[in-house]
């Protein structure tokens, strides 16, 4: 009775339960389809073939069915790299779909070749795409095979596709406003951006560039620059585009790594693009490719060791072993050349072709002479600032001093040099260099100073105390501008630090920090203007006059600061200097007793200091630290790139003489001017056509040289690409290691090998056909178990192989083997040595088959045993051998001559087997486990047992075969 009143208590903290069910149910596969896919997964060729044959007759299996992962039989075969089953499926016209894309993504080269060569027979019924299940489609509609292959960067697959003459859509320009781009963006902006990203990801593939581009280095340069610019427009995919841009830069650098001689390096760096307009086509040894690399900011390419070694050789031309000399010797040499630069310049003016004239044209000598000239200019600026020549300070328009007259030629030389540089390189290239902008500002200030001094000298002749001059007096403005230009001139010397390996990275870091300061100033100015407006609005009403202040001084520069926030400009100055602690707190006080106003003003002033000092200033320090660390992490590349730009400015023709000698016309200049004037204004008649023939000859020679240079360049590029591809494949194999795919491939190979050997030895039974239901199969398996062997019923489906009777012919070298003696129980030592003897046994089995190769026909179609039967009855093979030994008495009645195995009928063998002690045959169905995991584990266990049994049988067969006895053997493995 107590149980009637007993109530079970649920101690679970969550007593309510949520019923779960499958909301998006999918179509379940039939048992036959599961068995079909399972056979493809295991690599059972015979079963798959029989299933396909019966599907064509009975239509009981959908050969295009998919597993829960959305994989069809063809995709499973591709994933397992089972090309035999793939070919079998294609021969039966399975639906291909995205199989080619799937094979490309899995990088199965054999499958890609098979699918590319596959052509559906004419007249076959095509499976409509709409009837296939597209819910598992893994590829967007814009993905093509060549694009996917380029994404994987598989050289072999890309080569196969390029040989088929595939194409890739050409992406439009970054800011293209054509109808196609605008309409595509309006319809689906995400798809438009993704499609553009996929195209560029394919175009940036190193393997595709190496295969399809005539000039892969130039292609990588332009594509990397375009991707960098695109990352600034497509901010949503900025990281992806920057990664692709870096990939192109590394490809060009790696391609240059493969150069093995100075000749190859010179051919690469001196090659010029035929379509390049900014380079002179008459120059063939001006490092044109390197100039293009600098233009596109290919820092990795420029800083590559091979490139730097060639540049160093050209830079120190005429100074062999310069780097191995002591630093004292180097310093004395540079100082000597620097002091002699006026004489070298004069020698070049007189005779440019002389030894001294050619000596000053060397890049290193040119650099030393220009540096010495600039240092001389700075020294004269120092003399001018110290006022060595005493003048009357009260003269409103003073005449130029001797030092100022000496400075004037240098200023004119600087201006003339900048004009020539802008003329040669173009305005766009000129303004992209920040040092050129600094030179422009410096020269402008010097011109303004000279102009104002001339105005003051002409307009103001008298002398007047300086305290009485007006604020905007030309002399005062000229002196202020001259002081600013002196600062810029001194800072311009920092650009020469790039030539030094220690000061160069610091100079680059300083330039990067200036960008951070500009970014910081934008935010700081906004905060400054906001608080200046508020404080000025608050204290505008309390402005006092100067006569009311001590010493008649008004402003924050007085001994006692006052009226700090009376005007907007004064407020801006006060807040700026407060950052440096130069403003006192009492400036927030007012003469009237308005304590609330003072409190609000002090609070606003304190809040500004907190924001500007604690927040913004620390943010600036963090930004500058980040910039310095970024440069420090890539200091070598950044410095070498900046040094190369400095060196290249001295490699070019022209600009040989330093200021002020560059403003002196040389005889060569007069000769060029005379030729131009003669050809322009006094053209001569050419009745005989000599000039025309001369121009034609020069044009032909120039084009011939260009063709020869291009041919040499293509040969070098071909060699570089071959070396790069070989190195890429070698590195990929080295760094790949063992992955899960390798183990899956090994498992698939073992499974396929097992089924092939079973078919070869005839150890597989006739499975039942599809018409047998799964219940009947289980019942028949239970009846075949014999006495008491209780087997668990499992739902399984079998395929009828339908093999015909065939006879197997073999040489009469194998006699009947005697009954093996010894206990059948295996010790622990034997079980521990299973795997060690499996390898030699398989080798012996292969040797035995090779001996039969000339006489053995196709295996007989005896009933084949299943995998599960082999697992349960492992002693079946030994019992067959025992059965063959019992037939020894019958075989002795036969003659000792050669007896072929084909003379023994299958019925006689079966009758002899029934009269012997051989047990009942195993079940004749090939069970396909519904669980993939359980079937895989059973597969490995059964493979180990079968290998063990084969090994022992092969040892005994080889032993008897070696004795040379000739007797018939009838075995059934």
UniProtKB/Swiss-Prot annotation:
Zn(2+) binds at residues 172, 176, 178, 181. Ca(2+) binds at residues 418, 421, 436, 439. Residues 326-360 dip into the membrane without crossing it. Activated by G-protein coupled receptors via direct interaction with GTP-bound GNAI3, which increases the channel sensitivity to phosphatidylinositol bisphosphate. May be activated by intracellular calcium store depletion. Calcium channel activity is enhanced by MYLK, that promotes its subcellular localization at the plasma membrane. Expressed in brain with higher levels in fetal brain. Found in cerebellum and occipital pole. GO terms for molecular function: actin binding; actinin binding; ATPase binding; calcium channel activity; clathrin binding; inositol 1,4,5 trisphosphate binding; store-operated calcium channel activity. ANK repeats lie at residues 30-60, 69-97, 98-124, 141-170. It is a multi-pass membrane protein. Residues 385-404, 455-476, 536-603 are extracellular. The chain crosses the membrane at residues 364-384, 405-419, 434-454, 477-497, 513-535, 604-624. Disulfide bonds join 553-558. Keywords: ANK repeat, Calcium, Calcium channel, Calcium transport, Cell membrane, Disease variant, Disulfide bond, Glycoprotein, Ion channel, Ion transport, Membrane, Metal-binding, Repeat, Transmembrane, Transmembrane helix, Transport, Zinc. Residues 971-973 are annotated as: Essential for binding to NHERF1 PDZ domain. Its main location: membrane. It catalyses: Ca(2+)(in) = Ca(2+)(out). Changing residue 672 to H: Found in a patient with mental disorder and obesity; uncertain significance; no effect on protein levels; does not affect cell membrane localization; strongly reduces channel activity. It holds the Pfam family Ank. Changing residue 893 to T: Found in a patient with mental disorder and obesity; uncertain significance; no effect on protein levels; does not affect cell membrane localization; strongly reduces channel activity. SMART domains: ANK, TRP_2. Belongs to the transient receptor (TC 1.A.4) family. STrpC subfamily. TRPC5 sub-subfamily. It is linked to Loss-of-function variants in TRPC5 may be involved in a mental disorder characterized by maladaptive behavior, anxiety, autism, postpartum depression, extreme food-seeking and hoarding behavior, hyperphagia and obesity. This is Short transient receptor potential channel 5.
